[in-house]
Amino acid sequence: MISELQQKITVLKDLLKTNKADAILIGSDQNRFWLTNFPSSAGWLIITSNKAKLFIDGRYYEAARNFINPIVEVELFVSFKQVKAFCESNGINHLLIEGDYLTFNYQDWIQAICKQYTVINAQEIRRVKLPSEIQAIEKAVDITRKVAVKLKRFIKPKMTELFISQWITNELVKQGGAKNSFDPIVATGKNGANPHHKPTKTIVKEGDFITCDFGTIYNGYCSDITRTFLVGKKPKSAKLLSAYKKVEEANLAGINAVNTTLTGSQVDKVCRDIIENSEFKDFFVHSTGHGVGIDIHEMPNVSQSYNKLLCENGVVTIEPGIYIPNLGGIRIEDMVLVKKEKSVWLSKSIPRAF
């Protein structure tokens, strides 16, 4: 049986063939972890058609050498001269580099070690999730589900957004998460009109809607869900109740639309059309969703501009929203595992407002 590491290396080798390149240089923490399953904050990984080598500094060297599969050769990193020497000794003249992670600070150095380089969107290599990645994401979602179940009962009038946000953070760790996958968004009342509102000392009131967007990390992989709950039993705003129903309609339609025959933009349109053909047409102000994995936002996107087909075993969010200035907002976000026909609704058991 081919190991997951070998499958990932094959993905990179195919990328080399497609771009007629000699090697790919990986400097991002995310892609180093993706390939080696070894977390580190620095290092350079080079993959050729027949070699894989990791240059890593003294903080990680011994641990990496003992942990990482011997398919990947590990060398103590001292200076970039080692990487240049490796390229020269292996006849590497054309490098692929991670345009979505590397900064201009490295441009001169890369030009010095290689005659030619091609910038790629390196997140694309992680679009298809392997079984261990899916399992980690499923576990992260389940931890988030447990917190959401408690959260719905926990929220009470007179609590502040900040207090609720801190409770979410603590509870995610209690339930087995490593840490937040991002700072929780908690927005009550009028604050809900800001999609990325930062929690404040605003007090939760009876009859308000409160949007809670949060997730955790498990074994290096993220979850990301949003629920807009009602505080109490009767909403103060009939318009926001109507908005909730419309967002939920769009959310469910988007979840059901996800499969490998549609592009990200086509799924976005399914959700967007429902809202734009309603009284709330001016209040959906962001994309429908995004990929989730090692990064909280990664490929593929579910947006008006993403015209690639969704790939089997990709993981995406479906998160339509309505945001009405000076009134409030509604967002419902779920995670979906893409399949050829009927995709898997990973967050189906996470409670909703009604």
Swiss-Prot record:
PROSITE patterns: PROLINE_PEPTIDASE. GO terms for molecular function: aminopeptidase activity; metal ion binding; metallopeptidase activity. GO terms for cellular component: cytosol. The gene is pepP. This is Putative Xaa-Pro aminopeptidase. PANTHER family: AMINOPEPTIDASE (PTHR46112), XAA-PRO AMINOPEPTIDASE P-RELATED (PTHR46112:SF2). Pfam families: Creatinase_N (PF01321), Peptidase_M24 (PF00557). Gene3D superfamilies: Creatinase/methionine aminopeptidase superfamily, Creatinase/prolidase N-terminal domain.
